[in-house]
């Protein structure tokens, strides 16, 4: 028997029922970075169990026949139903965040089952269910729609931007592959604004990095580091405490981890199936380097840049594999040295077949 319950005082956040799917995303991401099949075998029952739970709790939406979660909410925002601009409503069917989470979960379970060569019949069922999920929708004003219907939001500046999960940390939305949805996310973020609690600002740093806007991400990162304690009054708000703990307020470590993740997203991304160097470099970060940052597929990256342009990278394979590198926008060609041999590549990308421990040194011109 599978059960869930609404937690505590208010359904706007207590009815968030897809947290288990979000947690499963972390398990799958660990596999993507390590490519550890033994680990995948250990976590597969958890992924499959979560998918089975949601398969048994989703229902058919009456207007379109979509498969949706219900009852649920889009944390922690509320909306007005047509004809009533007074009463905030939270409980709904199939909010966009839930659709994104279950799409991601089912897709990951299918991929894991195929890698482990198991559960072919169950994979077929999940593939059918995936086709029944609602599409992500753009509102009449151009924003990414938060609910199945184009409802009016109670708070257009709400600190939560739950329906952008598919942009980050998910990978369902990107400027490269879904430009219209990415633009809808951009408009949504501009409408919500940059203000918010510490963790909210941290999440927005990651959003803007995924959209390729390093200057906006950097602006938010600086606001995240703004002193949380008012020197004159002793009161505190959003920002950072003197000990560098992030202030919600009060202290919540989400902002610390999220802010650090945002810097990583500004410098290196790999969620789209290729290695993207300096995808959201702020104009003010004219020169720098990093060492040992990891990418999906099982590689480590070192990178140097100068005058805002990538100059040299080292790709080290931690497992055998094929690694695709997108050419930086500022580069005309890349000279890649592997095993004493040098190869020249031009845009848009190049692929490296590397053995475990093998390095490829890349110079950009």
Regions found by a protein language model. Give the residues of each.
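Long, well-ordered core segments of solenoidal/helical folds
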Residues: 1, 46-61, 130-141, 184-194, ...
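Long, low-complexity segments enriched in small/aliphatic residues
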Residues: 123-164
């Amino acid at each position: 028997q599978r059960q869930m319950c609404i937690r505590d005082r208010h359904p706007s956040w207590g009815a968030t029922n897809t947290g288990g799917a979000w947690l499963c995303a972390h398990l799958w991401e660990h596999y993507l970075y390590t490519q550890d099949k033994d680990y995948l075998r250990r976590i597969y029952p958890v992924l499959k169990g979560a998918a089975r739970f949601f398969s048994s709790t989703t229902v058919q939406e009456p207007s379109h026949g979509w498969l949706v979660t219900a009852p649920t909410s889009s944390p922690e925002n509320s909306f007005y139903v047509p004809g009533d601009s007074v009463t905030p409503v939270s409980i709904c069917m199939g909010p966009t965040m839930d659709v994104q989470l279950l799409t991601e979960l089912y897709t990951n379970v299918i991929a894991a089952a195929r890698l482990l060569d198991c559960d072919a019949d169950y994979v077929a069922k999940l593939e059918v269910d995936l086709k029944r999920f609602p599409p992500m929708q753009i509102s009449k004003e151009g924003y990414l729609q938060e609910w199945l219907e184009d409802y009016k939001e109670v708070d257009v500046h709400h600190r939560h931007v739950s329906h952008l999960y598919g942009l980050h940390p998910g990978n369902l939305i990107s400027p490269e592959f879904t430009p219209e949805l990415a633009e809808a996310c951009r408009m949504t973020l501009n409408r919500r604004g940059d203000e918010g609690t510490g963790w909210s600002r941290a999440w927005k740093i990651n959003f803007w990095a995924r959209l390729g806007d390093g200057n906006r991400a950097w602006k938010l990162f600086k606001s995240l580091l703004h002193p949380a304690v008012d020197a004159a009054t002793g009161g505190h708000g959003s920002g950072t405490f003197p000990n560098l703990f992030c202030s919600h307020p009060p202290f919540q470590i989400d902002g610390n981890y999220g802010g650090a993740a945002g810097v990583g997203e500004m410098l290196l991304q790999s969620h789209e199936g290729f290695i993207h160097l300096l995808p959201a470099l702020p104009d003010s970060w004219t020169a720098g380097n990093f060492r040992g940052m990891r990418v999906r597929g099982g590689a480590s990256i070192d990178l140097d840049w100068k005058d805002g342009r990538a100059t040299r990278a080292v790709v080290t394979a931690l497992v055998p594999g094929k690694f695709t590198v997108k050419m930086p926008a500022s580069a005309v060609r890349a000279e890649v040295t592997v095993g004493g041999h040098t190869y020249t590549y031009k845009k848009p990308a190049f692929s490296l077949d590397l053995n475990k421990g093998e390095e490829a040194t890349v110079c950009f011109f």
